[in-house]
Amino acid sequence: MRTLAVETSCDETALAIYDDQKGVLGNVILSQAVVHSPFGGVVPELSAREHTRNILPIFDRLLKESRINLEEIDFISFTLTPGLILSLVVGVAFAKALAYEYRKPLVPVHHLEGHIYSVFLEKKVEYPFLALIISGGHTDLYLVRDFGRYDFLGGTLDDAVGEAYDKVAKMLGLGYPGGPIIDRLAKEGKKLYPLPKPLMEEGNLNFSFSGLKTAILNLLKKEKNVRKEDIAYSFQETVVEILLEKSLWAMKKTGIKRLVVVGGVSANSRLREVFKKASQEYGFELYIPHPSLSTDNALMIAYAGMERFKRGVVAPLDVNPQPNIPLEEFGRIWT
């Protein structure tokens, strides 16, 4: 079977074609980072406008590069939730238009579910497993019992980890998106400043990054000659330590020794290095997708959509996007 997938939940316009036997047949992503960079973050109205401007040219490019026409597609997968509502509207409307015009079934996908199954595009993971989802909008831990069966273990109480990266980068005058910039700059850091690690009582699987962000702001005000490289290094080491400790506690609590780490922040080189070393030291299976699959893309939506379609899930043409349906609830609704 083949699906065409649509992803417009934030600031990437992405389309892909995936075949459950042949694999990836087409994949196109257009980032809006340059558009949002002057503002230090994503501006929802601008994001929606760029999606509207770009989705048809990207669609044409996808069909040309894949040499596939819509008659060869079995169904349309699309991101229904969560995301910026104005951005979601563009992708959902486009998916619905294709489904109506070409009489194709419409299959809804949860954005976080897509991230979880991005690793399956490279290697299947045995159930059950733990999923750490880390991005600009999410920092969550889930127990994945099977496809569509998700137990929420903990999440951020304030900023998402990717959001914290962007805000610290803005404090340092580094530009947007902050994650890749801090990752590169941290490699040149030498001095490790002690920074707070909130909610670190053993067994607490929730996250908090606002205090860490405030501590860096205070440090910058207090020490005038502080090196940006050292701040980036200190911030990143602290963040990676928090994420690893929480993951280890989740393993201890559940007894599960398989960990999937996904989302845009999973592309971070230091995080990959530390988690890989920890997997060898503590004896757990670690799965992190290739960096090209870590950030938002339509291939992950295609894979998850394929799994949903095989289970008989189809949405009506009057389905509307939702800004934030919890993953565990989505798994129960769309089964």
Curated annotation (Swiss-Prot):
InterPro entries: ATPase_NBD, Gcp-like_dom, KAE1/TsaD, Peptidase_M22_CS, TsaD. Substrate binds at residues 133-137, 166, 179, 183, 268. Binds 1 Fe(2+) ion per subunit. Pfam families: TsaD (PF00814). It comes from the Bacteria. Belongs to the KAE1 / TsaD family. Fe cation binds at residues 111, 115, 296. PROSITE patterns: GLYCOPROTEASE (PS01016). GO terms for molecular function: iron ion binding; N(6)-L-threonylcarbamoyladenine synthase activity. Signal peptide: none annotated. GO terms for cellular component: cytoplasm. The lineage of its organism: Bacteria, Pseudomonadati, Aquificota, Aquificia, Aquificales. It is found in: Cytoplasm. Required for the formation of a threonylcarbamoyl group on adenosine at position 37 (t(6)A37) in tRNAs that read codons beginning with adenine. Is involved in the transfer of the threonylcarbamoyl moiety of threonylcarbamoyl-AMP (TC-AMP) to the N6 group of A37, together with TsaE and TsaB. TsaD likely plays a direct catalytic role in this reaction. Keywords: Acyltransferase, Cytoplasm, Iron, Metal-binding, Transferase, tRNA processing. Its cofactor is Fe(2+). This is tRNA N6-adenosine threonylcarbamoyltransferase. Its EC number is 2.3.1.234. Transmembrane segments: none annotated. It is an enzyme of class 2 (transferase).
